[in-house]
Amino acid sequence: MSAETPITLNMDTQDLQIQTFTVEKLLEPLIIQVTTLVNCPQNPSNRKKGRSKRARVLLASVEEATWNLLDKGEMIAKEATVLKEELAAALQEVRKESKALKVSAERFTDDPCYLPKREAVVQAARALLAAVTRLLVLADMIDVMCLLQHVSSFQRTFESLKNVSNKSDLQRTYQKLGKELESLDYLAFKRQQDLKSPSQRDEIAGARATLKENSPLLHSICSACLEHSDVASLKASKDTVCEEIQNALDVISNASQGIQNAPAPPEPQAATLGSAFDELENLIVLNPLTVTEEDVRPSLEKRLEAIISGAALLADSSCTRDLHRERIIAECNAIRQALQDLLTEYMSNTGKTERSNTLNTAIVNMSKKTRDLRRQLRKAIIDHISDSFLDTTVPLLVLIEAAKNGRVKEIKDYAAIFHEHTGRLVEVANLACSMSTNEDGIKIVRIAANHLETLCPQIINAALALASRPKSQVVKNTMEMYKRTWEHYIHVLTEAVDDITSIDDFLAVSESHILEDVNKCIIALRDQDADNLDRAAGAIRGRAARVAHIVAGEMDSYEPGAYTEGVMRNVNFLTSTVIPEFVTQVNVALDALSKNSLTALDDNQFVDISKKIYDTIHDIRCSVMMIRTPEELEDVSDLEDDHEVRSHTSIQTEGKTDRAKMTQLPEAEKEKIAEQVADFKKVKSKLDAEIEIWDDTSNDIIVLAKKMCMIMMEMTDFTRGKGPLKHTTDVIYAAKMISESGSRMDVLARQIANQCPDPPCKQDLLAYLEQIKFYSHQLKICSQVKAEIQNLGGELIVSALDSVTSLIQAAKNLMNAVVQTVKMSYIASTKIIRIQSSAGPRHPVVMWRMKAPAKKPLIKREKPEETWAAVRRGSAKKKIHPVQVMSEFRGRQVY
């Protein structure tokens, strides 16, 4: 391609730095051959000297690799239109160094144990590698020159498009620009894939996206400017788009040449919060022997103050609620005091070989305060996300509607609201990044947020232009293009923020917010406030839709099974039944308020459907958390402990939870409950031993057994004041879930029993199924008895012990029945397979496959925290007699 304008290459032709994978790959064969050729021992051998046939073969390989590179270099030199002299000189240098290596290598192969000859070969090999590298780097520069020529060609057409004076020239120039963009994008993509630097690859990818996105916008805006040259906002939009395109061209030019673009603005201090918390938690556990106040105190205090500064930024954010601001401040003060107490204890223990109990207590307290502050920050951020991303497009739609109707006076107010809305979205997105460790997700969030910031003033200018020319079709088209672009990046930002946010935290906070909105709805209805009722109902619909969307997306990442089916059943119930019923009731209420006929409205029916939508959200959250570990459940439980909201529709949100009341039982009752729980855990260990050997990917019986086991464990945790179940209604719901799982297990096991040809085996399996049905019903009764516990005179009545004991006993009996059912189902399945295999293939009800053992490394890798350890002496080899090994072997326990 001939360049009309000289292309300036900002690359040093003498620089041997390899920037691309292609050059690296071309050099690799030569490096391997040369390295193998000169790879001989440092100390010469005393053996008889002789010629090495292997070395001569390697020398031939080096020559072959060199000549292959020379052939490619000569082809490039013939086709090149630039750097011809440099290429010719580089080729000559490679030939010269190749001959020098050949001479020194032949001498070396005659006497491979003579060190001076070896050193001569090494020097010649290095010179050859340097010459070849320079040749390949020059060839790479020619590729860059080709790309820059396309950039220059696009630049010229781009300048022509900016200055067109009529629509025919505009259309012709835009078509030419489209073709050149296609060629430029292809070459830029190739360069992007070839560059070794991840940051430069990302820069080119972003620039390519900017060119594709802004080129159609430029055409539309230029067309509008030709029709309405007197509209200043159109000219401002055109200047902004042109600046974006020019910046993208500069980025491609610089990144392809390895030039660092303008440094990105420093991340806000809050962006380091997550890693700062991790570092602080790792540093608070020290050895008293090595602690000195001069080193430890300034270091820990500096790190803590950095965290508190970031927390203060979050607390002062316009999105932060007053309640959370106060709690963040309180936790900051508490962690400051905990650190001072910890440092005081360290100074008291200086020089001691072991930590005292008070020091250990101070360390535990500091860790707890760190977790508490982290939790408060996380809650505040989730609050912001839940509120800000509730309805992301309404401000834009209102702005566009005002512009279409030509309401110029209102545009400024709506533009200010839209600008504030954009700023809030960007601020909340950055806050979400501050506590996340998902680097890829954070990168996507920041890119999308930057695009929204750039689009905001352009959209406002487009709206101003539309307001001044509401009947112009080209201005309408421009506004529509901006709207689609905005909606695209809003979708990207929302998905990215959801991706870096814990779904458990989001569901817990969303449940709380929906309860607040439900209360606002009921208050507004009773106060006959139609505006607040409509606003709160809209918030409920938006939050419920967000919950359904996020949970459905989360389930897409799981293999279909009992877990996903249970979750999606609740989600579908929410979207297909509950939300439509709620919308209907809200419309009825609003209609009644507008006609002043509130007396004809059934107030209780509205309260019931409002409570139903909250209960469904709670059910979705419980079903999502069914597979969580006890530690994860406890963390989410802590997230909610101080997030209780008093409900006007349910007395259960007043005062302490029933779970908290269980901790106030007399010590004698607690001991008896602990004994019952210990017996239950013994039975649980039997079930664990029975199901842990089976692969549950195609065995729903094992899946259901695990699920029932987990729910029963949660119910027993409730009796000790722990776990995710907070109210007696949760216990009743858990018993209902167990009953449903038992019914599904009954269906599967009965299919196995019906196919089993062994009557005794079939009879035993059916008997165990009857036990599951009986004990499931008993468990439901016990959970309902527990719900009747009352608080009289500030103390729990004595019958609580009997209720709890009955609950745990029923759970233990049910667990035993599940254990026996799993065993007998497997036995019956084996009989079906053995007897009916000769009659032809038959699909089994479930597949009984042994679980594959966990993968273990052949060589134990040293843990990062153990890298400081001194070199240890190898343990002495010890012979163990086989009889001793056999005597210590213990198989799986049979119950």
Swiss-Prot record:
Name recorded for this polypeptide: Catenin alpha-3
Q: What is its main location?
A: cytoplasm
Q: Where in the cell is it found?
A: Cytoplasm, Cytoskeleton; Cell junction, Desmosome
Spell out the GO cellular component terms annotated for this protein, sorted alphabetically and separated by semicolons. adherens junction; cytoplasm; cytoskeleton; desmosome; fascia adherens; lamellipodium
Q: Which organism is it from?
A: Mus musculus
Annotated GO biological process: bundle of His cell-Purkinje myocyte adhesion involved in cell communication; cell-cell adhesion; regulation of heart rate by cardiac conduction; regulation of ventricular cardiac muscle cell action potential
Q: Does the keyword Chloroplast apply?
A: no
Record PTM Phosphothreonine, positions in chain: 361, 649
What keywords are assigned to this protein?
Cell adhesion, Cell junction, Coiled coil, Cytoplasm, Cytoskeleton, Phosphoprotein
What tissues contain this protein? Expressed in heart (at protein level).
Its lineage reads:
Eukaryota, Metazoa, Chordata, Craniata, Vertebrata
- Gene name per UniProt: Ctnna3
Q: Which positions are tagged coiled coil? A: 74-107, 325-379
